[in-house]
Amino acid sequence: MSLSKKLTLDKLDVRGKRVIMRVDFNVPMKKNQITNNQRIKASIPSIKYCLDNGAKAVVLMSHLGRPDGVPMPDKYSLAPVAVELKSLLGKDVLFLKDCVGAEVEKACANPAPGSVILLENLRFHVEEEGKGQDPSGKKIKAEPDKIEAFRASLSKLGDVYVNDAFGTAHRAHSSMVGVNLPHKASGFLMKKELDYFAKALENPVRPFLAILGGAKVADKIQLIKNMLDKVNEMIIGGGMAYTFLKVLNNMEIGASLFDEEGAKIVKDIMAKAQKNGVRITFPVDFVTGDKFDENAQVGKATVASGISPGWMGLDCGPESNKNHAQVVAQARLIVWNGPLGVFEWDAFAKGTKALMDEIVKATSKGCITVIGGGDTATCCAKWNTEDKVSHVSTGGGASLELLEGKILPGVEALSNM
């Protein structure tokens, strides 16, 4: 699956056509009020491009939350999004109370030129994800012929298809892979994601550094192994570092995270790194806490001293930060996935913050810096660095699966150039 050879919106002829666009409007809500409109704002360039280039209509579809195939308009309706979209676009948005069926097909068949239409939550139908639950909460699977009918109805709502929902690209859901139209392009958000991951995974500049944090080795095995085939350097930090250090250095790790499953493959990982000539940097000192709590008593430890019984490593220390700074300064391409400590708590955020500062500095000197989604993207938001790195991915799960070397169904379904 080549990321850089997929059809993109700027190469798609939209004039006079109805564009059906899969977007990610899965925004946080409180009492039916949107608390963060970032994802809606992010879709505006693709929508405006279609309107500015003479599209007859833009029909938008998205999921919101996890209604599991049960219509829950009181809790998971996209109606508030239509209101927000209207104010961001400065034009009317027609909101439909369903996403498939005769009435929806009729409304989208011959809309007034320049119309913007938002469909109701795709996940009110079990056929979107292929599984869900019935109103009583019992798990159910969608019937194949009903999935086919659902996809056929969606396919009638547009003449060309655009996918701008990278965050769901790792899911083979109906709206991602089942719209049957001859031209299927990535929107601008999706294109930016694919461009940056292509830079990292298909033709990287070197030295290439991967920084991998997070809690469990077992969760990151596939990621570590795939990246070891691509990078020159790797920093391993976060909770999973303690498993490596215990196995490799026989370090006393106190009550720190230890991953029994992951421990079994630490030596395999190190052998692969050695074979590929990849240098792995681990933390050498730690900020510790006497409990897993924001107000824990704070201590310090080194690999040599070990961590006292009952205490746990919750961040890396100042010597580790110096080592990280040296490794980052040499790189020309950096992919970072996973924080180095419990960054949500100030006492244990310094390691991740120091690394973020170095990444920002490297970016300003021309290094390409790609931040995987999830917690690392949250760090960028917390320290206001989203515009100071090359790219912050909008898809936690999707970016992780790409870095693991997996094929994303939502990307594979797009037309090739």
Curated annotation (Swiss-Prot):
Gene Ontology molecular function: any one: metal ion binding
Q: Which residues carry this modification: Phosphotyrosine?
A: 196
Pathway assigned in UniProt: Carbohydrate degradation; glycolysis; pyruvate from D-glyceraldehyde 3-phosphate: step 2/5
UniProt keywords, alphabetically: Acetylation, ATP-binding, Cytoplasm, Glycolysis, Kinase, Magnesium, Metal-binding, Nucleotide-binding, Phosphoprotein, Transferase
Q: What is its EC number?
A: 2.7.2.3
| Major enzyme class | transferase
According to the UniProt record, one GO cellular component term is: extracellular exosome
Membrane-spanning parts: none
State what this protein does. Answer: Essential for sperm motility and male fertility. Not required for the completion of spermatogenesis.
Under the heading InterPro entries, the entry gives: Phosphoglycerate_kinase, Phosphoglycerate_kinase_CS, Phosphoglycerate_kinase_N, Phosphoglycerate_kinase_sf
Q: Which residues bind ADP?
A: 214, 238, 343
Q: Where does Mg(2+) bind?
A: 215, 218-219, 375
Give residue numbers for the modification (Phosphoserine): 2, 4
Catalytic activity of the protein = (2R)-3-phosphoglycerate + ATP = (2R)-3-phospho-glyceroyl phosphate + ADP
Positions binding ATP in this chain are: 215, 220, 239, 313, 344, 375-376
Instruction: Please report a single Pfam family linked to this protein.
Output: PGK
Q: Which cofactor does it need?
A: Mg(2+)
**Cell location:** Cytoplasm
**Which residues are modified to N6-acetyllysine?**
11, 48, 75, 86, 97, 131, 146, 199, 267, 291
Q: What is the name of this protein?
A: Phosphoglycerate kinase 2
Q: Where does (2R)-3-phosphoglycerate bind?
A: 23-26, 38-39, 62-63, 65-66, 122-123, 170-171
Record's CDD domains? Phosphoglycerate_kinase
Quick one: a GO biological-process term for this protein?
A: canonical glycolysis
In which residues is CDP bound? Answer: 214, 219, 238, 338, 343
